[in-house]
Amino acid sequence: FTTGWQSQWQAALESQLLAVSPKARLISVDYGKDPKNYQAAPIKMTFRYEIPGYALSGEREMLFKPMVMNNLYNQVKSYLRINTDLEERRYGFKDACSRLVELDETIQLPTGYKLAGNGKEDSAQSSAADFEGSLRQDGNKVVLHQKLALKKRVYEAGDWNGFRNAVNAHKSFGDYIVIKR
């Protein structure tokens, strides 16, 4: 988002939201301390939005995908385009860069709804990549947390299992969430 004029940043964020749903509306955005200097340190952006009708409604239940895992900024997540269906690799592989991806989302539930099931927790560590993630209910909110560390840009074939396990664990948090009344 920092490649354009600062006056266009909000429009760029709205464009990202509209890639998820044409009903999305940006309420507010906080770009953090020094967003223009994004190469000096990790950036943190916080934005609030609403999407009327985003959840699919059934009888006494709703189904939806976490926003941060539903086509939001996918163009910069090159690791999602690496085919992790392969069980083994005979040759090294590359990603665009090493990276630390931290995704946190808090979803306000309608009155009377609860997360179906017990939530989810997963982690994976290796010399190539680490992952930790959780999905839980906290009062009337569903809280999603993910931290994916891809430690290299150029990987050896022997790094494949660690990379694959971490990325697949990350992807698994993009499954639909069911809440019930």
Language-model segments: residues:
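A sensor for short, sequence-defined functional sites
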Residues: 1-181
